């Protein structure tokens, strides 16, 4: 049996199988912050990628194009932290958003997620914590200790509260890896350096401690060996015992001298420390004691990153091959392993208790029994309570404690046991029952309540039954927790909590007999019964039939409760509930009419029998409800006339339900019955329903009863909303007839619907005492003239005054007009005007009077108003008109009066006097009217002056339009008169702008010449001069030069630039020259005129540096480099040195460039200038000057110049320059080109650059300087990336020996790498195969085996190929190679060793064939090796086919223990062939897997008797007894025949054998057979047979034995019968006792119940009786 292992080892996935490049599986490119994600940085082609592998979905890796130095995934969510240089960013991959970013001042050398939202950042100097939340920046936690200087940081850990921080690093010292740690306390702000390689924090609660301790575990491999330390950090919490320090040795195998710890994780679930070393060993330690539990190697490659594995509470890691591995505690095995393998039962017990692990059952049971036997019951109780998985918490344990009597004054062992269990957690079902039974007997119910609240007891039906006898409410709690529905509902009912029954039944899906339950509740409390009934029907589907529920109510005559219930149950008003609605109303109309009235009033129901209910309502005196339900008009008319018995408001609403004809009939009946009593109701009905009944019908109804009062009130209620003219007119009529004059006034004033003409005529005819209604109508509808005539002719003049004074003063003008029309006296009119005093429109009054040519009538009144200070324009307008008509100095009035309306008066004057119209319009700025008057009357001078003074651009724009036929005479007047007269600059400015806006350049020039050139006030005005020149540029270019020369006060630069933009280059040049702006002048010559000769002459004439600079720049652009450089020198201007240098480089003017750069260096010591000067000196071959320059102080980029010289093959100059800057790499390259190889090697050594070494090396190879080339090559080959190029360079030129010599020399280098060993092996395979084997045996572990494999195969080095396949674990290929090339490659030991490791089992059979062909004598040895994995059936079939079974007999014997049919049959055949019957019998006895019958049939014909005996034996084994016995009889095997007959248990067969013995006269055999087949033979048959053959003597022993057995049986039967009779006699003597107390059913009620009806609360009630199937124990 294989040894049990305490760990479970699992490979989760292989990263290479997911497409991850093996080169990217390493500490610097792969991170794993938790067991959720693995993050790898890869480069695919030229694109950098980050690959994220979700461990829950590893087959779908996420690839993102991200270029970063490092990437770490959040431990729980798809959030990634990226680092590029000093920039840190946090991204949410799912949201595709950046969460946070920060730029560090120092490089981050290591970082790690220490929690779900915090990243730790480690720089060379300090450690920071950076929170993912909010906007916070990284917070510095502590400075790094000097002991970690120069270390590679490999981990950073914190404790759970982040109060202790640990930084871990490693470094190489004295040929070993030394670990350094810095432990930092956040609270104390102090650090402690510690030597250690791997560490972790853990929270551990010691036995007896109230709080957890913070433990710090670290492992170290020092010079003295390995140690694991476990200590408590900080001060222990109050009340805690300090954790004792632990320091245990860590074992490292002798072959792992350089091994050291690399990772540590602590399982919180199992309190186990997982320690992993660099060589792939796993160590498990108990956290509490430090004991080593297990150690083994789990990986041949280094596991470089680990994390806790949450699913198994173990550790997960990745090794350099890309395997993702996990190790965890095997919970089923670890305790047995510690007990049996480690022989540490104390540790096994401790871990089993502490971590609740199985496997220590026997230990616990043994310890418990021992303590119990010693009488140490308290300790035994602790052991039983603490045993893992509750293995000792059994009824047997409780019975044992119960059997121990309590000592006086001490707690009983049972209670001690229960006390410990209660402290630890919940009791199970049996424990709860056994604890509660004595507690309840002692009356300590409060303890039970306390335990239930603390959830210490497992509730069950039995416990509820136990508690119910004491407290039903508490029992209810138990039943609820135990989920016993029938008992719960029973308790709810008994405790009066009926409101909970339905809710609970629904919750648990239990359905009791609801009606029966309701009856029982109703007996106890009708109110609770009502509440319960409502709960039964509150859902969409009632739990019980409502009719049955109502019957229950009615059984107890509970009308009120039944009503309440039905009101709630029928609230949805369903059609199916009609009979119930009728029943509800009927019971209330008969017993409680008011309640029925209220129900009907709420209109809850609509599906009851309305006719039946109507009759009942009328009988109950509910006339209103009866009307609601009547449908016959006769019934309605009979009831509706009794309005004193009806609610008026309701009655009005009731009419809304009647048809139009029925309503009118009812109204007529009501008025006929009692008009005085019913008039008001009729009016209300008419008012509300007039639209439906038609207003005309209602008017006719009231008029038919001559009820003007009713008509007035009816129409009064609708007149305010009606649009019917007839309604309004009838209302006015009714109001007049009822004397409601005020209402007549109101309706005449407010209504807009009546016919005014009809009303006016009616009011005239009505001859009312008060004429105000007529006045209102005439005023509103413009009948004022008729009104005045009517009143004046009827001598009602006082109403005229009332009208204009009180009703509408604004109508005075019309009234005055009317009075004038009836020739009323002027004095009356004047007095009337004076009385009203301005509450009317003066304009209208003037218009009325003016129409009748009586305007002067108003002069006194107007003057009086003006004298009073009236500013009303209408008054002044009227007065102006009178003055104009009377020619009373009108112009003065028009100029001085500020109140009249200019437009009105101007319009009045246009035909009378245009000049006065202009005055009026000008005063009011009536622009358009004034322009029209001036244009029509040719007043252009006045218009031009007005426009200049007006200063309105829009107005100017309107008159200067081209479409204006009067534009030209107007412009002439503006130029000649208006502008000449003005002195206001603004007027001039607006006028000029208007001409510009109107695009009149020629007219503008004419205007400006008048202003500027004619010595006016504005001659020296700068803007006007500018404008004149600009306008000339635009309109008449021939005048521009004249204006430039004549004018002096203009903006020269601006004008010049405008001239340039208009291509007037000569004019621009003239302006610049006139004002001495020489730089601009020469720029015009260069850029616009394009004449460099004129520019050169102009520059010589003015001789200004700026001018020379401009010219030089132009010459440079034209390619005149020499002339440009001369001009720059004359300008003493080095500013354009870059352009000059570029131009000189292009044209090759190096001598001139030297002069220019020497001038420029004097002005500005620019680095570029000095750099170019050096290059120019080199180009002119002035090496002495160059050397002198570079040896002096300078700012030149000498390296850059050297590279340029090198590129242009100026190697002498380059040599000087590289030597000056000590660039030995480039110096070496230069020396190579100069042929100085030794000096080049010395330079390369100083440069120590791979590129330089390569260049010099290749040059030396080309120069056949192989010694120097090898010196260079040894510095190249250590770089794996460069090796291939170097090898190809040698090989392409055929220098194989030199290349091999160089690589052999390189193997001893300290930095020798796999590529060197690999390439040398390949070279050996090609050119020196004899050295290949030795090289591989020495260095196979350091070569790239796949690459060398291909080379060896190509070179046909089969032995070496097999060796490599073996080392590379490609065993299949190794075997195939040996079989394909046995002469060179096959070795017996090696073949047998490798063949067991192959993956393809088919190779076994090829190997068998190979051995059979080439090594047949060794075939059995091979088969022994192959047998564990060989298909023996197939092998046997093969050997049978090739007829070589005897050859492999040893193999067949060795594998026969598998009981394989083919093997067994083959061996049996061999044994038969060899006539080895003993071996055959042994084989068939030991191995039964073969065709028994076939073998038996074959053997029964064999010539040897022993084989025939075996055939009989086989027939017997297959229940072919007769055949077997017959065969034995045939071969005289009497003993076998008797034995087989006995074993057959066949009486007939045994008797036949007896007969045969007698026939053959074998009497001794007959006697022997009687005893052999004793149990099968019938004594009578034997007696008869013996008597017949006269052999009684031979049968007598048999008969004696038979007689003995029969007598013994008879004696036993006799004794048994006697005993039975005695027992029956004793039973009959006992009296029969009646009246024995019968057991009550267990679920019967436990409280006293009064006598009940047969179906009360007795035993037959389903809710409280014996549990029904489906709800009790019978489930």
UniProtKB/Swiss-Prot annotation:
Q: What is known of its domains?
A: The C-terminal third of the heavy chains forms the hub of the triskelion. This region contains the trimerization domain and the light-chain binding domain involved in the assembly of the clathrin lattice.
Kindly list the positions at which Phosphotyrosine occurs in this protein.
Answer: 184, 634, 899, 1206, 1477, 1487
Task: Name it.
Answer: Clathrin heavy chain 1
UniProt region (Involved in binding clathrin light chain), positions on chain: 1213-1522
Q: GO BP, one example?
A: intracellular protein transport
The segments labelled WD40-like repeat 7 in the record are 302-330
Name of encoding gene: CLTC
Q: Please list where the region (WD40-like repeat 5) is annotated.
A: 196-257
Q: Where is this region: Proximal segment?
A: 639-1675
Segments of this protein annotated with the region WD40-like repeat 3: 108-149
A Gene Ontology molecular function term for this protein is: disordered domain specific binding
Where are the annotated CHCR repeats, by residue?
537-683, 686-828, 833-972, 979-1124, 1128-1269, 1274-1420, 1423-1566
Q: What is the lineage of its organism?
A: Eukaryota, Metazoa, Chordata, Craniata, Vertebrata
Q: Where is this region: Distal segment?
A: 524-634
Region: Flexible linker; residue ranges are 480-523
Region annotated Trimerization sits at 1550-1675
Query: What protein family is recorded?
Result: Belongs to the clathrin heavy chain family.
